[in-house]
Amino acid sequence: MIRHLAIMGIVLITLPLMNISAQKAEKSIGIQLWSVRDDMKKDAAGTIKQLGEMGYTFVEAAGYADGQFYGMSPEAFSKLLNANGLSFTASHCGHPLPDKEQWEATMQWWDQCIDAHARAGAKYIVQASMDKKGYGSLADLKRYCDYFNAVGEKCNAEGIRFGYHNHDKEFEEVDGMVRYDYMLQNTDPDKVMFQLDLYWIMKGGKEATAYFEQYPKRFELWHVKDEMELGQSGKMDFEPIFKKAELAGMKDIIVEVERYNYTPLESVERSLSFLMEAPYVK
């Protein structure tokens, strides 16, 4: 009887831990490495190890330059991630809109960039923002859309999806048109997907779900973000957004934290726990 009670006690203690492990196995959640940029500069290998131990399953890089990722070759970066149970899903990088004279050199830059990402095993390359030309006239924004279509075609040839990440300025009007709508209407869905930042669209005064209804299947990646750690501000109502994930075309969710109540590593761990515990995150 005593032995039976002891076994039951072990089972009761173990069950919650098993549930947590099961959640981590079932939910695939990525981390934007910009969230831990200082840690990556100090100790990339140690930081990646900690992120894998937290339960993140993939990363979005923010450290590409000159054919390398955080100073590592594409193969070395991929090996580091895989050794820690992580995959390389996406990367923030990009090049400003070139003038006609700079077009060929810019396309060569993209060729090197795309090749490096293909060698590292990335699925997505995301341009994180535009320079001031993109926030000027609709004529300049149209040039950006044409540019993105050209880059997206190059990415497609290497089996990579190209996309654009918003801040709040994309939801301002120019010449009677909301910039973000103009971009969605003037980019080819086969060449350009959109990474919707859920916090910045809220700051821009728009509803994510309204965009899902109007432009279904265009939002393959999401930045799940709050003012600080996820759930901290009380301003973000994530549940109705996640309920429209299929309509949006969402394939992967990525945590990003840029302002912190704790150390960056603790902040991203708390944010991961928030999503792990959220029943609407599948």
Go through each PLM region and give its residues.
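N-terminal pre-domain/capping segments
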Residues: 7, 21-123, 217, 273, ...
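Solvent-exposed, polar/charged alpha-helical surfaces in well-ordered, non-transmembrane soluble domains
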Residues: 49, 53, 75, 79, ...
